Amino acid sequence: MVKIRLARHGSKKRPFYQIVVSDSRNARDGRFLENVGFFNPVASGKAEKLRLNIDRIEHWKNVGAELSERVQALVKAEKKNLQTAS
């Protein structure tokens, strides 16, 4: 099964997550099919905290990919921010 999930990068106590499309059998930080964004929970100042490629996420959802709980929450928040910004 294909999943859209977070892959952890960064150093100890400074997490940085890539949002990737991956086969569920692969390791969390292992091989992936496509990188569709990133999430930086410890961003400060003007650093970008979240970037998502919504078009590609929707494409993968239509193909049958399943989103992890955290990615679902991030996508929902990003869509809400886009609606209020317009």
UniProtKB/Swiss-Prot annotation:
Signal peptide: none annotated. Pfam families: Ribosomal_S16. The keyword GTP-binding does not apply. It comes from the Bacteria. GO terms for molecular function: structural constituent of ribosome. GO terms for biological process: translation. Keywords: Ribonucleoprotein, Ribosomal protein. Disulfide bonds: none annotated. GO terms for cellular component: cytoplasm; small ribosomal subunit. Belongs to the bacterial ribosomal protein bS16 family. This is Small ribosomal subunit protein bS16. It comes from Hamiltonella defensa subsp. Acyrthosiphon pisum (strain 5AT).
